[in-house]
Amino acid sequence: MKRALPAIETAMTAALVAWIGGMFALGAFSARILFRDLPRETAAPAMSTIFRSFDGVVVACVVVVALATGLRLMAVGLRHRPDRIALVAGTALTILGCLDVGYVHPAIARMQAEGGTLEPAFQALHTLSSRSFNLEAICAILIVGAYAWSRRET
């Protein structure tokens, strides 16, 4: 199983790039440009549609992250600190991704469809979504860092 480690870590890294990089691009560029150039009542549903369509990418990446986390655990165990960091960060990332696509994003879309974007509950969900992304990015950095750190110990 240890011989598969480069493939496992490459799959994980590719999933992290697609997921975290994609979410960063959508939030930093798409949302900023849409809300700058379009009326709010047009930009908000457009961004909601974009994020909903990107949820398919997130689901695929969550599956890869979960599998890679489990396979890496079987391959190397938990003997070294980087291995424990990678396990905890991969597990946290999987949970955060499931929370996003299973609850946060659908709740935001539902409130948007009902015209509740000015409600405090919508703002709370939007804040939760932003904080979840920040935690996802931190988890991704921890995973990549743990992979690099584990190379030093072998």
What is the predicted function of each stretch?
Residues 106-116, 132-135:
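Phosphate-binding/catalytic loops
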Residues 55-62, 126-141:
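Hydrophobic alpha-helical transmembrane segments
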Residues 2-3, 149-154:
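Short, charged juxtamembrane terminal tails flanking transmembrane helices
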Residues 139-150:
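Membrane-water interface at the C-terminal end of transmembrane alpha helices
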Residues 73-91, 152-154:
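Cytoplasmic juxtamembrane regions at transmembrane-helix boundaries
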Residues 2-76, 111-123:
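Interfacial loop at the N-terminal end of multi-pass membrane proteins
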Residues 3-16, 81-90, 146:
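Alpha-helical transmembrane segments and their helix-start/interface "positive-inside/aromatic belt" motifs
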Residues 91-106:
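Mid-bilayer segments of alpha-helical transmembrane spans in multi-pass integral membrane proteins
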